[in-house]
Swiss-Prot record:
Domain of life of the source: Bacteria
Record keywords: Capsule biogenesis/degradation, NAD, Oxidoreductase
Oligomeric form and interacting partners: Homotrimer.
BP GO annotations: capsule polysaccharide biosynthetic process
The name this protein goes by in its record: UDP-N-acetyl-D-glucosamine 6-dehydrogenase
Gene giving rise to this polypeptide: wcdA
Gene3D superfamilies associated with the record: NAD(P)-binding Rossmann-like Domain
Pathway: Capsule biogenesis; capsule polysaccharide biosynthesis; Glycan metabolism; Vi-antigen biosynthesis
Function: Dehydrogenase required for the biosynthesis of the capsular polysaccharide, commonly referred as the Vi antigen, an important virulence factor. Catalyzes the conversion of UDP-N-acetylglucosamine (UDP-GlcNAc) to UDP-N-acetylglucosaminuronic acid (UDP-GlcNAcA). Cannot use UDP-GalNAc, UDP-Glc and UDP-Gal as substrates.
Lineage: Bacteria, Pseudomonadati, Pseudomonadota, Gammaproteobacteria, Enterobacterales
pH dependence: Optimum pH is 7.2.
NCBIfam families from the UniProt entry: NDP-sugDHase, PRK15182.1
Gene disruption phenotype: The disruption mutant cannot synthesize the Vi polysaccharide.
Family under the similarity heading: Belongs to the UDP-glucose/GDP-mannose dehydrogenase family.
Length: 425
């Protein structure tokens, strides 16, 4: 086994997780950043991160980092970190395609003694049961004799400028005690918050998947509370504010649960659970409730429009925001699409305005073309769907200026004071 000074790192996948890793390692040691997306590589070489997770200055500081889409350029590396997405399919089952392809790619360049670390969120057992056999088959080598693996789950929070890679504690693990120690030592070089060496790869995998499952369930609880309080004509935000006066009340807010983690990861755990004969009722109940919130929001809006005497069929609706969270360009698994589709069933004409998104990416992924400018006095209903700073700065007067004389303003994200909107979650 090689020592810490002999580690030659390749980061496989340069998205929200991989790029920050590559940049931090690249500030102090030779690193190759690999991605199959040639456009992405060209942008990064020009100092541009369209995800806005890394600044041009930070890219310049990573003077030992090289970007490539050529497999040959990673052959000399011996420490591979795989950071590809792990989505779900239309049946809400794990889609391991990116992980499988990345494992096949790395397997073709593995040499004896090499280490492969996975950061992608998976179910417990996936690394050793799914990925290791691929590495062994592609390389023709024996696991834990010729090559080794580890698991260190990503904890990146897209758009968060306070909690970043280096100041979030990192869980590490390895397939042998010696390998676990080396992997931990490698990450300690860039993680100022420190590391936590888990007892096994499965423990590390399970720890990651329950982080987001716990959060998903807490949001499901407040979503259900919001539905109850709306029927009781009680303002949900006011209730949460009052309850939050106790020190141990958890400050979760209701809303649409999208993105690449919280709305996806629980399905990885439930998939594994059902595979071993246990039906996880609470986790799946929470997922069902959160998955249906788009329909609930749409129904709330329609009822408010009818109450105001607005003809729903053929009405114009403006949705402010399309990303899955505020102040971030990430549109992966955004559940605002559920609202768009549901309103379409009522023959509403929906416009999307979001200054953070790449319009072409939205068109390609969702078949929607966002508007670049918003018409004044045009809409029968307006939904503030994402709490972007730009929308907060507008205030209710400017936002209502997009509406007709008679319209409904739905503040989904508590951007405005309660009395300034017609409907709130």
């Amino acid at each position: 086994m090689f020592g810490i000074d002999e580690v030659k790192i390749a980061i496989i996948g340069l998205g929200y997780v991989g790029l920050p890793l590559a940049v931090e390692f690249g500030k102090s040691r030779q690193v190759v950043g690999f991605d199959v997306n040639k456009k992405r590589i060209l942008e990064l070489k020009n100092g541009v991160d369209v995800n806005l997770e890394t600044t041009e200055e930070e890219l310049r500081e990573a003077r030992y980092l090289k970007f490539t889409s050529e497999i040959e350029k990673i052959k000399e590396c011996n420490f591979y970190i795989i950071t590809v997405p792990t989505p779900i399919n239309t049946y809400k089952q794990p889609d391991l395609t990116p992980l499988i392809k990345a494992s096949e790619t790395v397997g073709t360049v593995l040499n004896r003694g090499d280490i492969v670390v996975y950061e992608s969120t998976v179910y417990p057992g996936c690394t050793e049961e799914e990925c290791v056999p691929i590495l062994a088959r592609m390389s023709g080598m024996t696991f834990n004799q010729d090559f080794y693996v580890g698991y260190s789950p990503e904890r990146i929070n897209p758009g968060d400028k306070k909690h970043r890679l280096t100041n979030i504690k990192k869980i590490t693990s390895g397939s042998t005690a010696q390998i676990a120690e080396l992997i931990d030592e490698v990450y300690q070089q860039i993680i100022s918050a420190g590391t936590y060496k888990a007892e096994s790869i499965k423990v590390a995998e399970a720890a990651k998947v329950i982080e987001n499952t716990q959060r998903d369930l807490n949001i499901a609880l407040v979503n259900e509370l919001a539905i109850i309080f709306n029927r009781l004509n009680i303002d949900t935000e006011a209730v949460l504010r009052a309850a939050g006066s106790k020190w141990n009340f958890l400050p979760f807010r209701p809303g649409l649960v999208g993105g690449h983690c919280i709305g996806v990861d629980p399905y990885y755990l439930t998939h594994k659970s059902q595979g071993i004969g246990y039906y996880p009722e609470i986790i799946l109940a929470g997922r069902r409730l959160n998955d249906n919130m788009g329909n609930y929001v749409s129904e709330q809006l329609i009822k408010a429009m009818i109450k105001k005497g607005i003809n729903v069929e053929g009405s114009s609706v403006l949705i402010l925001g399309f990303t899955f969270k505020e102040n971030c360009p990430d549109i992966r698994n955004t559940r605002i699409i559920d609202v768009v589709k549901e309103l379409g069933k009522y023959s509403c004409k929906v416009d999307i305005f979001d200054p953070w998104v790449d319009a072409e990416e939205v068109r390609r992924e969702y078949g929607i073309i966002p508007v670049s400018e918003v018409k004044s006095s045009h809409y029968d209903a307006i939904i503030v769907a994402v709490g972007h700073q730009q929308f907060k700065q507008m205030g209710s007067e400017d936002i209502r200026g997009f509406g007709k004389d008679k319209h409904v303003l739905y503040d989904l994200k508590y951007v405005l004071p309660a009395e300034q909107s017609d409907v709130r979650l």
